[in-house]
């Protein structure tokens, strides 16, 4: 599945913002905006036992331009919450359920 960082109208959002994947399915986050975004998984809102450092970008790491991507594959079933560090306060938060 491809998830856009930034809506087509310039909104600070993940598109889609709430989605499901199968365990082992690749998720590709793609910057859809002219400014930096990233994908940080919330260590308190992922399944127990998952190492957040293995799935998350760091808060200081960015996809700086349109078309830049970050991919991750989640193998543990459950719900994962993620956010864009610079825009979390503006509501740029998403959720993925792994089945």
Curated annotation (Swiss-Prot):
Chief location category: plastid
Compartments where located: Plastid, Chloroplast thylakoid membrane
Listed GO MF terms: copper ion binding; electron transfer activity
Example of a GO cellular component annotation carried by this entry: chloroplast thylakoid membrane
Occurrences of domain Plastocyanin-like (ranges): 1-99
One matching Pfam family: Copper-bind
Binding positions for Cu cation per the UniProt entry: 37, 84, 87, 92
Matches recorded under InterPro entries: BlueCu_1, BlueCu_1_BS, Copper_blue_Plastocyanin, Cupredoxin, Plastocyanin
Keyword terms of this UniProt record: Chloroplast, Copper, Electron transport, Membrane, Metal-binding, Plastid, Thylakoid, Transport
Membrane topology: Peripheral membrane protein
Keyword Membrane attributed: yes
Cofactor(s) the protein requires to work: Cu(2+)
Domain of life: Eukaryota
SUPFAM superfamilies per record: Cupredoxins (SSF49503)
Role of this protein: Participates in electron transfer between P700 and the cytochrome b6-f complex in photosystem I.
Miscellaneous note of the record: The sequence shown is that of plastocyanin A'.
Annotated family: Belongs to the plastocyanin family.
Protein name (record): Plastocyanin A'/A''
Native source species: Nicotiana tabacum
